[in-house]
UniProtKB/Swiss-Prot annotation:
This is Small ribosomal subunit protein uS17. SUPFAM superfamilies: Nucleic acid-binding proteins. InterPro entries: NA-bd_OB-fold, Ribosomal_uS17, Ribosomal_uS17_bact/chlr. One of its GO terms (biological process) is translation. One of its GO terms (molecular function) is rRNA binding. The gene is rpsQ. It holds the Pfam family Ribosomal_S17. Signal peptide: none annotated. Belongs to the universal ribosomal protein uS17 family. It comes from Synechococcus sp. (strain CC9902). One of the primary rRNA binding proteins, it binds specifically to the 5'-end of 16S ribosomal RNA. GO terms for cellular component: cytosolic small ribosomal subunit. Part of the 30S ribosomal subunit.
Amino acid sequence: MAVKERVGTVVSDKMEKTVVVAVETRFPHPIYQKTVSRTTRYKAHDEDNSCRVGDRVRITETRPMSRQKRWAIAEVLSHSPKAAAAEAKAEEANQ
């Protein structure tokens, strides 16, 4: 059986080792043929707490880790420009 994968954007990183990833699906309406977009939010396991809000990530389906968490971060595709600027600013303040 193939492993399910999704690509989405991190919308919340306030939990410990967990992020909320919004995945947008686009499809034509069956009758009117207008493109409809639906957003599904998945809770995903982030072992290193490396994801920030705005990051594009790939998630894969895993065993149940908690009541609502059944996905894990496979890789970070791109970091958010805001998060990168905030990290650089924090690094300058520490020096």
